[in-house]
Each structure stands twice: as structure tokens, then as C-alpha cells.
Amino acid sequence: MCGIVGYVGSRNCTDVLINGLTKLEYRGYDSAGIAVFSESGNIQVAKSKGRLADLIHKMEREGRPEGHAGIGHTRWATHGEPSDINSHPHTGGRVTIVHNGIIENYKELKEYLSAKGVTFASDTDTEVVARLLDYNYNGSPIETISNTIRDLEGSYALGIIFADHPDVVYATRKESPLIVGLGKEESFIASDVPAILRYTRDYYLLEQEEIAVLDHSGVKVYDAYGVEVQKERKTADWDMDAAEKGGYAHFMLKEIHEQPTAIKTTITPRIRDGLPNLEECNITPEALKQYHRIFVVACGTAMHAGVVGQYVIEKLARIPVTVDIASEFRYRDPILSAEDLVIIISQSGETADSLAAMRLAKNRGAKTLAIVNAKGSSIAREADMLIYTHAGPEIAVASTKAYMVQIAVMYLLAFEFALAAGTIDETECRKLVAELQQTPDYISEILKNKEQTQFIASSLITADSLLYIGRGLDYALSMEGSLKLKEISYIHSESYAAGELKHGTISLISDGMPVIAVATQKALFEKTISNIKEVKARGAKVVLVCRDTYQPDADVADLKFGLPDFDDLLMPMLAVVPLQLIAYYTSVLRGNDVDKPRNLAKSVTVE
């Protein structure tokens, strides 16, 4: 949530800031702004409510800041409504800042400063930080930042410039992510790697309360007490092309089509002699035997990947698995022990609730395993064990390929757990692994049938509300399909276990209401068909996602998407693809901004 970019170098700073902020649009925002040192050393600020295009148009009308050092920001409103005044950057006297996070004690700090005669122009917690920095300023930016952050409670990533230190950018963080990009005679700060890929792949990870100083001589980093520290240079394994659309109309469509490659890249290094091998992740069969319970903790789409994992691990390994929403897990006072494994799933590795849940689990003695896509992220660094998914950058807010590789990893874990528990033998495991390796080819074939998903989408665009139903693994899929549709089409959608319809939900069915039924599980197929007939008889317009071999009668479905025959257990990896495409094309046909849906952020870094 929110995006921060900063630059010091010889390039046109405004161009660099706008380009970087464009690469961070996926994080979600409702306003944008930049602050740039002019050639004479003055700070020029331009900011606007709305999209980056609105900011660009405003600069064209009112004047474009020019210079070689500055900071930029895309804001997601948390304190104060979206407006020009509340947009970042915020200036307090001699200090101008951009901020990602939430300052929990901003009201107390504001009251303290107000009592000292300080006045405020906005409703934001960010301006409070700017005014506090100015109030504390003693001529030494590093000392002032160090003294000020000790008074801040909550989370923050800050880009800071001081009026009397032209062409120098300062940065610090606590909980909220921030990196320092290292170019040739230029340097950057950014909330995420894609913002700097056009210029460099090298960067530092800024640790908690460290202070970075960027000037024309390079970068220096200090700890919270002003002592210089040596940093390890890291190199991103993504290139600029990975963060571009590559000829697709939207990032989401590109990322849906990248799923076969992402699966191969993620699972191939973890398979040896036809069996799962997670030793590189410090996961061995011997270690897995010690766990008597598993908790999967995540948010949104990642949580849905955990539900698939729950079904598969319990079925194969016979180990009890509980799936928790991270924000609920933290506050329900979970009972944990050293015999429990807590699996944290997060694409960004910075999801605030998931990070806090993991820390809680560690404090209570449980072992933690992180499944993340972003290298060097907070969750990745703090987990006891770690599996990286190799999806590459996922720019669209609605997750697709990250979900796919998350469930691929959950399958590998399930196979490894089952082998360790002795509930399957190596022959059966090799068969399952071989089928998992076949999924990319099957998905590639499914992606060729876009016309059917477009046709289905055209039947949904006027709907006000719809339901997704399924049983077992199909119910897990219906949860993800429903979320995808509501995220980007803005159609109200809910998922329900098909067997629960008669317990209240069926009262919602009205004539012409769309119901998307997922029925891929052979063992549950007839029962699901019975549930489908019940909603069809009450006027529902049914879209059936099932195996291609089944030909539904008129009393079962109006439309069908057929899937190849495949192992029940692995069917989610195939069946989710048409659900993704249906959501995508529905959104496109409704004229929505698919990659940047309203009110949503890609990485939720505040609670």
C-alpha cells in the first residue's frame, strides 16, 4: 500500500520519479505527488488527487519540477480523505517527506506539537511526522531522524529531504518495506524492486530503523544511533522485461499466460529422481515427522491457496491442518507448541497481518515455514524455513500466477509430508509428482480456449450478484474464483459449499441469477450435480466448470467450460484457469481498469 520512490543522480529527476511510481501503481493509490530540488536548491512540490495521469496533467498546466534529486509517492488514504491537500509529499518548515505506513500515536504527537504552537494544513499522520522532524531539527539530518523515529509508534517507510541539504535524500523504515537502489553514479529508494529495474538491478535491503543517505557521492547507511553500517549488495533476478506487459492488453492477462512457465520454474529445482526434494529449503523428511499439527496462515488469495493445501495434506499425509486468516489468527489466542508447524503464505513477503502472525507463532514456540515470492522480504528473512516461489514480478493487483505457484508448492509439501509419514510409498509419490509436472502442458492447452471464457463472461456483465459453489477441492476453487470476479468486475459475488445451499443460501436464488458451479471431483460429482439442479430449478443461470467428458442436460447447466480428464487431487491447478479468465474478461467487458481495481492494493503493508 502506497509507493515511495526517491532519486539522486544526473538524470531528470521528475522523469525517474514518475517512471518509478508508474511501476508501483499495482500497490494501489488514490493520489500522487513529487518533491524535487531545483537547480537553485529550492524544493518544488507537485501533487494531485487521482491517478498519475492527473498529476502529469497538473504539472503540464502549472509547471513541471526540474532537478536531479527528489522524492515521489503514490498515496493510499488511511488518515484523511483523498485530496490534493492530504496527498504526499508533506512539508513541515524545512522538511519535506513521503511516508508509507501508519503512525499509531500521531494524535498524541499532534497535540504535543500544537501545544508548542505548531500548525497543521492536512489531516494526515504524515504531516505530523514532517512537523516533528522540523521541530526536532538541529542542523544534523541523521541525528534529527534518529531522535524523531524513537518517538514514532507504528509502521513507516520514509523518504525525507531537508531544505538546507539540497540534492540529498534520506530514508528510514520500520515494518514497511524500503530498498535502496545502487546505480552508476546514481542512487534510488523504492518500496519495491520493479520501480528501479529500468536503471539498476542492484540494491540494499534497509533494515529496521536504519537510515540511508543518498547524495551525488553515493550511498551511506547508518543504524538508529547514527553509526555507519556496511551493507550487503543484492541483485534482483528479475529484468525490466518481466515488469512490462510484453504485448498483452493487461498485466493480469500476461500473468495468467505465464503460469505454465512459473510452475516449471518453481517445481523443477525441487524434484530429484522423480521425488520431491526440499533440502535446499532446510525441509527434510526427518524434520517433518516432528510436526503433529499444521496451521496455514495467510490473507486473500494466498489463504485460498492454503485451503487447497489443507485438503491435499490431510488427504495424503493424514496430518490435521487448520487454515486461518492472518488478521484473525493473531487475535484468537491460538494454542501452539513446538510440535506445530505454522505455514505463512504471502506473495510480497510484507503482508502486515501475516508477518505479525508469524512473529506470534515464533514467540509461542512453533516452527514457521514461509512461502513467498519476493526475495529478501521481511517474512522471508524471519521465517525458520523458507520456500521461494519463482513467479517473477506480479504487477496486476488480482493475483493469478502467484496463486498458481503457491498451490504447486503446497502439493510438493503434501507429497513430502506423506512420504515422511509413510502414508504413501515412493511409487505412488513418483506418480503424483509426474502428474504435477504435466500440469503446465495442460494449462497451456486450456489457455487456448479463451473464446469460451469470453462467451461466459459476456453472459455475466449485467449481473448484480452471483454465487460460486463447489464441494471439497472445488469449494476451495470457488472461493478463489469468487474473489477474482468481485475484485476486478465489481460484481457482488460469494462462494458457498454446495452442500450448504439448503441451509439458507438457496433463498438468494432468483430468476436469471448466475451461479458458477465447479464440479471436477469425481467422488463428489453426483452430489454436486444434485445441488446444481436445485438452483437451476429455482431459476438460476448455471455456468458449469467440469470435465470435458460430461455433457450436462438442460436441467443442469446453461453454459459449460470443459476441462481435460486429470487426477482429482491435482485438478485445482487446471480448473482455476477458466475462473481467472472469466473474471478477467468480465472486467474487460464492463470497461474496468483490470490491473488497478478501485480501492485495492497489491501489497497490504498496514493492518
PLM features: what roles do these ranges have?
Residues K289-K431, E435-Q438, V518-F561, I582:
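Glycine-rich phosphate-binding loops that contact phosphosugars or nucleotide phosphates
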Residues M1-K245, A249, T261-H292, Y331, ...:
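Conserved short alpha-helical segments that host acidic/polar catalytic motifs at enzyme active sites
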Residues G181, A305-G306, T322-V323, A352-L355, ...:
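Extended hydrophobic-aromatic, low-complexity segments
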Residues D125-V128, A305, G309, V405-M410, ...:
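Catalytic-loop motifs flanking and including active-site residues across diverse enzymes
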Residues H68-I85, R272-E286, G309-I345, T351, ...:
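Glycine-rich oxoanion-binding loops at beta->alpha junctions
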Residues Q259-I263, I267-F295, M385-P514, S587-E607:
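Active-site phosphate/pyrophosphate-binding segments
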Residues G226, K541, A554-V556, F566-E607:
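Generic C-terminus detector
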